Amino acid sequence: MRGLGPGLRARRLLPLRSPPRPPGPRGRRLCGGLAASAMDELLRRAVPPTPAYELREKTPAPAEGQCADFVSFYGGLAEASQRAELLGRLAQGFGVDHGQVAEQSAGVLQLRQQAREAAVLLQAEDRLRYALVPRYRGLFHHISKLDGGVRFLVQLRADLLEAQALKLVEGPHVREMNGVLKSMLSEWFSSGFLNLERVTWHSPCEVLQKISECEAVHPVKNWMDMKRRVGPYRRCYFFSHCSTPGEPLVVLHVALTGDISNNIQGIVKECPPTETEERNRIAAAIFYSISLTQQGLQGVELGTFLIKRVVKELQKEFPQLGAFSSLSPIPGFTKWLLGLLNVQGKEHGRNELFTDSECQEISAVTGNPVHESLKGFLSSGEWVKSEKLTQALQGPLMRLCAWYLYGEKHRGYALNPVANFHLQNGAVMWRINWMADSSLKGLTSSCGLMVNYRYYLEETGPNSISYLGSKNIKASEQILSLVAQFQNNSKL
């Protein structure tokens, strides 16, 4: 299950079809001084100047054509590097007036020292807040009022994130503009503006096609596969925005099962027990895939809102439901483990990953030293072809995976983005499952392991507060026992 929280690179959650670019003269290529002058002239005309504080509510909005010119020009840029350059110029040249900020800050400090009355101080603070608003925010605000403007800004942020990832544009001004745009999108895509829609086999063909295309966690193979995923004992929901009904923004797939699932094969490959749902067979709801369809909405809390809304819908439909859990992939585990094997392989004689008996057992099967042989086997997933090697690796891989999820941190929070997402939601790191994803993708990315993050509804609030505030991870006895085994065997 793909996570949506911070760190998730909010990644790129999906390799998926982007919304159409805004209209414009396609294939425009600008170069050298012509490109710079054209961009500067465009920005000078399109970005509204900041009115004086006293005139902030009396200044008319810029002509719609000015914003439309920016949209058209941007949509016509053929190369990612050109779009990145324009965004870099926008961030660098049309941000906050630091001179005004310094002046207003000094004014606030002076009034505090003079112990002036509250009304005077509050107005000075309001002036400071006004000075802290970057000029490009005005451009984004006016673009949002155009027909299709919000969609354009979602794509613009996707381009900005891609440009940052490719290092086409960098620096604090760019990061700040990304944060401002993310904040604005979070307001426009707050839960009050989102519609929850359920997908069934009778949904419009266009919706089914989009859901199929955006499924990157467990790809849909064909129409029969898609029919199974929206059929009996399955639920599929998505959020759409009130301005674009029927257009999926984030999609959640749910399996209705008798207990908490420990492998994905039983969900995506096996047919349901009956064509008609028998309510007495349903005791658990398993969130096995969540996918963001628009890269520009990374970091906007759509996934969290969607899970909460779906839980309420399922409780209405199945009051007897007693368990809510994810069945999540563990992206990055194999890469992390290969990194450790590389480090320890270079330091001859050092072994903090396997016990002596495990090393002997693995070497007996592979015929080579543990570190070197495992690097090849784990990268390719070939190790599962040997029953003896599979058995020998179960103990150490479970132990190492528990540490990766529970012990490896980024700024005090779980390094793994999927873990971080669910822990922020207040879920419990509940169970690691052996050979839970036997696909090639599952074997090469996470050694076939998957993990359940369980949602105890009455505890999610306190758990979330504890994780976000104190960085405490709530975990089950299984996880903690595996972590303790790792710590006893390692000095990491």
Swiss-Prot record:
Interchain disulfide bonds may form in peroxisomes (Potential). Interchain disulfide bonds are not expected to form in the reducing environment of the cytoplasm and mitochondria. Acetylation at Lys-471 activates malonyl-CoA decarboxylase activity. Deacetylation at Lys-471 by SIRT4 represses activity, leading to promote lipogenesis. Malonyl-CoA decarboxylase activity does not require any cofactors or divalent metal ions. Disruption phenotype: Mice show an increased expression of genes regulating fatty acid utilization and likely contributes to the absence of changes in energy metabolism in the aerobic heart. Display a preference for glucose utilization after ischemia and improve functional recovery of the heart. The modification N6-succinyllysine is found at K167, K221, K385. It holds the Pfam family MCD_N. The keyword Lipid metabolism applies. Residues 190-492 are annotated as: Catalytic domain. GO terms for cellular component: cytoplasm; mitochondrial matrix; mitochondrion; peroxisomal matrix; peroxisome. Its EC number is 4.1.1.9. Keywords: Acetylation, Cytoplasm, Decarboxylase, Disulfide bond, Fatty acid biosynthesis, Fatty acid metabolism, Lipid biosynthesis, Lipid metabolism, Lyase, Mitochondrion, Peroxisome, Transit peptide. It comes from the Eukaryota. The modification N6-acetyllysine is found at K58, K167, K210, K316, K385, K388, K441, K471. It catalyses: malonyl-CoA + H(+) = acetyl-CoA + CO2. GO terms for molecular function: identical protein binding; malonyl-CoA decarboxylase activity. A motif (Microbody targeting signal) lies at residues 490-492. Residues 39-189 are annotated as: Alpha-helical domain. GO terms for biological process: acetyl-CoA biosynthetic process; fatty acid biosynthetic process; fatty acid oxidation; malonyl-CoA catabolic process; positive regulation of fatty acid oxidation; regulation of fatty acid beta-oxidation; regulation of glucose metabolic process; response to ischemia. Homotetramer. Dimer of dimers. The two subunits within a dimer display conformational differences suggesting that at any given moment, only one of the two subunits is competent for malonyl-CoA binding and catalytic activity. Under oxidizing conditions, can form disulfide-linked homotetramers (in vitro). Associates with the peroxisomal targeting signal receptor PEX5. Catalyzes the conversion of malonyl-CoA to acetyl-CoA. In the fatty acid biosynthesis MCD selectively removes malonyl-CoA and thus assures that methyl-malonyl-CoA is the only chain elongating substrate for fatty acid synthase and that fatty acids with multiple methyl side chains are produced. In peroxisomes it may be involved in degrading intraperoxisomal malonyl-CoA, which is generated by the peroxisomal beta-oxidation of odd chain-length dicarboxylic fatty acids. This is Malonyl-CoA decarboxylase, mitochondrial. It comes from Mus musculus.
